[in-house]
């Protein structure tokens, strides 16, 4: 087994990142989606299949209904998830899973039954020789070269703040909100409606997601930016739709991600903001470790990729933290792959060899072995 490269798969709500241990970046990055034809005749004659996965589903989205098997970080549809894993191994990476140890990632607070089901599918359906299931935020911390810190991980389906001390997460202080990339896309569609642009179908929502990812940024001072947007056209940017029409996006560019900082004010949602989530998680920890956490706030995940988000989070946390503490927010440029890179690094360590759940372990103990071996 030692001579077979480990496969590292980070299953996000929105995007699968997969590749090989020891490499710097994932080889395969594709949407965690399955598309099925809205009506059968729509695809007749076009090498029609009954379903499409990942990029292919994305390309044909106009005639498909799009399904996401992972919702808010948790796998909800196991049959579809199995298809995504199958696609990951055989199509994207072109490997035989029974020849490679596999590291899978999971959301913090993942239900125990889910961890067991993942384990069962890997050993029984894919016959992997060895498996490890790692918490996403812990891997992000490793990829930042730290073992202590608090990770603010915002993906497509869920946002978590996870305090970690000496490599172990502190479960009672983990916080989560169901406010992440997908919600920002929906909110962006709402803001565009104000301008008379209507996007509703799953295909149109993919256009909105693209607008959000390409044009949005976080304002350091929201009120000042709003005032400026009324007085000038500084923030206006054009976006060309697939049909060639050009639309102009103005203050929606920073109003959209402001939702993360002011969920109630921006969209009437009684949720914690990301600064409250981070601060509260730190306050839940032992007083002796708080300083270390404040000095190592790590941003991770695609929804933290907005320009200006690190500076704004720093400003918000500094306003709440004790004045004697030097708060530090770390936002590495490729943080959307931080989880995957952490998995690649961890599995490359010689000390990791003893961590695997082997096929023998599984045959002897069943799926519950995952709770003992993967802390």
UniProtKB/Swiss-Prot annotation:
Single GO term (MF): hydrolase activity
Keyword list, A-Z: ATP-binding, Cytoplasm, Cytoskeleton, Hydrolase, Nucleotide-binding
Name by which UniProt lists this protein: Actin, cytoplasmic
SMART domains associated with the record: ACTIN
Main location: cytoplasm
SUPFAM superfamilies, alphabetized: Actin-like ATPase domain (SSF53067)
GO cellular component labels: cytoplasm; cytoskeleton
Catalytic activity: ATP + H2O = ADP + phosphate + H(+)
Keyword ATP-binding: yes
E.C. no: 3.6.4.-
Pfam families the record matches: Actin
Alphabetized PANTHER family for the sequence: ACTIN
Protein purpose: Actins are highly conserved proteins that are involved in various types of cell motility and are ubiquitously expressed in all eukaryotic cells.
Family indicated by similarity: Belongs to the actin family.
Organism this protein belongs to: Sterkiella nova
Localization of this protein: Cytoplasm, Cytoskeleton
